[in-house]
Amino acid sequence: MTRDALMPAESPLTRHRIDACFLGPYGENNNLLEKLVVEFLRDHVYWRRNFHPEDPPAISTEASRHPDYLAFESRMRRELHQLSASLKKSVPFHSPRYMGHMVSDLLMPGLIAQILTLPYNPNNVSEDSAPVTVDMEVQVGLQLARMVGYVHDPLRADCAFGHLTSGGTLANYQALRVALALKAFPVALRSAGVPDLDLPEDDWSAFNLHPHKATQLLDDWLTWLAAQPLRERKTWRQRVQQERLEYLGMLEFFTRHAQLRVPHVLAPVTAHYSWSKGLKLLGLGRSQLQLLPEQGMRLDTDALESTLEKCRRERQPVLMSVAVLGTTEYGTFDPVDRIVAARERAAALGLGHSVHVDAAWGGYLATVFRNEDGSLRSRDEVARGYHAFPAPEVHAAIAALADTDSITIDPHKLGYLPFGTGAFICRDHRVTALLSEEADYVFGGASATSYHERYRGLGQFIPEGSKSGANAAAVYVTHRVLPLDHLHFGRLTRQTLLAAESFHAGANRFADKMHGRVNAIVPFQPDSNLVCLALNPAGNTRVANANAFVHRLHDDMRADPRQPLQLKQFFGSMTTLRPEALGDTEMRRILGQLGLDVATLDGVGNGDDRLVILRHTLMNPYLIDHENGISYIDLYFDYLASRVQQLLAAHDAA
């Protein structure tokens, strides 16, 4: 893709350029938003009128005065006014007073692009229904591939491929689908008896190839097939198809190949619940999801190595190892580099499997690590201007993304785009040949001769049968206005990381200020822009009492449609710390620092087997308002101190 003329290399994203990115906490950019939306809606009307202008208007000028027309307009206005009134009870994600879940204000380029595209109503299932936006979606996949370090040159055979999804859940499902198709395909080739290919010697070896080798075998098969006469080509394609897992189904496939077992998926205990849903949807079964313990908020790679060795010894196949780049609850990064290394060692011993990174939250943080030419910045280069970011483990995890097989990223999280916009990216697009579904009424026509032509029939390769082109336009335009490197989009994510460091420092000051009344700690060093805070009233030793105290604090920071929004000073969220996520040593350390007796972490299933903590997602770029000299982070801790004292006073009075 050519460099975006709107954002040249010598023009980094500055503070005042950030000011133009959003509608703003106070709606400061309302004139700009209104001007552009009206301009492009008018442009859409002109487009309609210029399509065969000789056709007479189907709606007469007199229709607007007819009683039925007026009655419909009146009813529509009434319902829209009621909708608008009801929406005033929505959570104010746009405000720097919101520090709750993974959502903030929307980037105006994406918002306007989505509004602009909606009246055209493109369906990105194919170029017949979306001749413009389907190309944009393919480009978005390449933009994201470049951001994570995958090959993004469509002229290369091993170029990456990505597409948008409704969210991270569907992207994770697509990752499972791709990994399973690739894992089982060499077995189908053996069963079909395809000649002239260097096939593995038995089903076990075929089912446990390294993904790179399985992809090369797929490419060899397609090359061999293309060289056959037309009739034989059709025969061999059908023969292999009838041996594939997708054709036979799980039961028949594993019955025919008795030495094989349904593969496991290895994931950290902090993995999103979508992995459980995905295994159920795919028919693998929830029991195949093996959740591994954490050590210091990161996947315990010793446990991973032990599990892989046990699987190899017991001849239990593994479908994939999952790393999380920015956990939903804590924002922490798993050691992607060490997980990839563990896979390489296992594959060398005959236990090949995929590595997938669930970077739904942390994916866009890679912009901070990328130069304009797509190369990786050193840790020292990235660290300039920060107090502690990035930890060596974080830089190593980002650097290793290029060595993984697939990645989930959510533009509707740290990409500041409307909900309903996730993304799946695979390292090598050739594997999508295993996903292709043919439907002549949608995908008929000549065979594709290039990367872009191939993926204009996007619906052949994705789970959805219909998908919004407006979402693709929103992401594409956003990435064009804010290229995915440290000078452009990375300046925005940098603001959030600086806010996280400021919050961490503020939490330490808060703890000193409240010493003797409440014990407060940041339980672990933040990896990203999500910071947790653990609290316990001084003198209390019971986990149940500490949990009840934090619940009462959070009650004042949660949305309540029965109350006016203005009664809320701040919005936050909460989560829990569990021994299986932290490890016993870390859990004991945290409980000890809070003055809690570990014996009261009873684990009887009534909620006191975990510690409830406050969770703060620091996405808003105006948490530190330089224009007005206001720190909403400082205001938050002032508010928190006041609420803590009120709750303690009420408890003492009782």
Question: What are the residue ranges of the model-derived segments?
Answer:
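Conserved PLP phosphate-binding loop immediately N-terminal to the Schiff-base lysine helix
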Residues: 295-297, 321-333, 352-397
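N-terminal entrance/gating region of PLP-dependent enzymes' catalytic architecture
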Residues: 2-160, 170, 183-191, 220-223, ...
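Intrinsically disordered, low-complexity acidic Ser/Thr-rich regulatory segments
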Residues: 223-264, 386-406, 594-611
